[in-house]
Amino acid sequence: MDMSGAGDRRSGAVRTWLYVVAALVVAMVAVGGATRLTGSGLSITEWRPVTGAIPPLTEADWAAEFAKYRDTPQYNILNQGMGLSAFKVLYGWEWGHRLLGRVIGLVFFLPLILFWWQGRISRRLGLGLLGLGLLGGLQGAIGWIMVASGLQPGMTAVAPLKLALHLTTASLILAGLVWLAAGERRGVLAPAPARLRATALLLPILVLVQIFLGGLVAGSHAGLVYNTWPTMDGQLVPPLDSLFAIRPWIENFVDNHALVQFDHRVTAYLVFVVAVLHAVDARLTGPKSAAGRAAGVVILVLAQMALGIATLLLAVPLWAALAHQVLAMAVLTMATVHARLSRGFGLVEPAAAEPPLGFEGLAGGRI
């Protein structure tokens, strides 16, 4: 019996599910960015993974939550005199961010259990999904550790390093989802030459590094200084005594606004140069499909650079900063899909190449 049609439908369902989860992760990053930019991230002072899904429902509940917030350094230093109505707005952003995280968990694990039972998950895919599930759980813990850092005495915001780690982990989950989804395609796709495959893989790695550096810029508010381009304080390269003004020197990479912003700028140039060289190489030596995808990466990188420059020159308005963060996810998605497809696909259907996990795997693959 020819099972190719059934295999295509099964693979398509899994691929669609993975892309839906990836889209939810992008939404999560967007809501998280809005939560940070509106100063809402410290409005919920407790981590209750289950009961926290229920927001305050009565005036007494709201008064209790507001009383907890009034004990935080952020309130006492920045927001003294804030009324309950303003607090509800802050609380709504943070609660929505956490609720979306719970929704992502359900949308990820419930279909995963169903697909596993139906035998639609191959062993290789299953291991990848298991790793992403564990990383998602770790991400929740990282989020609370980040929030807790902002509740310490004298703090009015979360620690920049923890914010960057939280953003990068979300980005890594997104990259993993689209990598696995792209790998679920059926048919035949010739692999690109080895050099192109290597540089295609380098691109999402560089983008992840750049996202981490962007998290440091956001967390330290380094985008609010040196609001000129291409120079910083009138120079293309600030003097070393400005870049390494803090002792010990290693702390400059997190706490020195000049070095934090300079690192983000230089890495952006590096990503652009690598993307352009890769696209030229793909045009000259690679298959047409790889050349088209590589050109798409360049276009997105160029758009992201332009938006980043505009965000800097405008002194980080909320809309520009949020768009810059979301477009970074688009760049990462395109670069990751391109890297995965550059590896090509063989003639053998994955479902036939290895036994599936789940009920059908135990039954020998008979349906």
UniProtKB/Swiss-Prot annotation:
Enzyme nomenclature, EC number: 1.17.99.9
Top-level enzyme category: oxidoreductase
Q: How does it sit in the membrane?
A: Multi-pass membrane protein
- Which residues of the sequence carry a binding annotation for heme? 264, 324
Give the highest taxon in the source lineage.
Answer: Bacteria
Which Gene Ontology MF annotations are present? metal ion binding; oxidoreductase activity, acting on NAD(P)H, heme protein as acceptor
> Could you give one GO CC term from the UniProt record?
plasma membrane
Needed cofactors, names only, are: heme b
Where are its TM segments located?
12-32, 99-119, 127-147, 163-183, 198-218, 266-286, 296-316, 317-337
InterPro entries in the record, alphabetically? COX15/CtaA_fam, HemeA_Synthase_type2
Its keywords, alphabetically, are: Cell membrane, Heme biosynthesis, Iron, Membrane, Metal-binding, Oxidoreductase, Transmembrane, Transmembrane helix
| This protein's record includes keyword Iron | yes
Substrates-to-products reaction catalysed:
Fe(II)-heme o + 2 A + H2O = Fe(II)-heme a + 2 AH2
The subcellular localization recorded is:
Cell membrane
- State the similarity comment: Belongs to the COX15/CtaA family. Type 2 subfamily.
Give the protein's biological function.
Answer: Catalyzes the conversion of heme O to heme A by two successive hydroxylations of the methyl group at C8. The first hydroxylation forms heme I, the second hydroxylation results in an unstable dihydroxymethyl group, which spontaneously dehydrates, resulting in the formyl group of heme A.
Q: How does it assemble?
A: Interacts with CtaB.
Please give the name of this protein: Heme A synthase
Q: Which organism is it from?
A: Methylobacterium radiotolerans (strain ATCC 27329 / DSM 1819 / JCM 2831 / NBRC 15690 / NCIMB 10815 / 0-1)
